[in-house]
Regions:
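Amphipathic, Lys/Arg-enriched alpha-helical "gate/interface" segment within cytosolic domains
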Residues: 1-127
């Protein structure tokens, strides 16, 4: 699987784009890399785009990767994840697992809605 991480310091968020197929180990690696980038850049908002994913990830792997990332650090960036309509069930599951582990996360089917929620109350936007 391919992915890109882009830091938007102007608006104060990190964008992660997933492409192709994925598995448990790759999900964990990407999440850990994103956390490192967020901490290094002192950014507390993460926007995750999974519209480019193909295939599927098992519910067990979604549970394991989300749990691992939520519990791996005290730093829990606010995370908005958005995808296609056919991914809604999985994204809602990720949201539930994350919220149950005190991770501020919300799933969306629309990028603009995800970004609006993510940046709501962001000091950089109100300066």
């Amino acid at each position: 699987m391919a992915f890109k991480i882009k830091v938007n310091t102007e608006e104060g968020y990190i964008l992660i784009r997933h492409y192709g197929e994925t598995d448990l180990n790759e999900n964990i690696q990407i999440g850990e890399k994103a956390l490192q980038v967020a901490i290094k850049n002192r950014i507390k908002n993460v926007l995750v785009d999974v519209t480019g994913l193909t295939g599927g990830v098992s519910i067990t792997d979604l549970f394991a990767s989300t749990s691992h990332l939520a519990e791996s650090t005290a730093e829990k960036p606010k995370t908005a994840i958005y995808g296609r309509q056919d991914q809604q069930r999985e994204l809602e599951f990720i949201e539930t697992v994350g919220l149950n582990r005190s991770m501020p996360i919300k799933s969306f089917m629309d990028r603009n809605a995800a970004l609006a929620w993510l940046l709501m109350g962001n000091k950089r936007n109100s300066d």
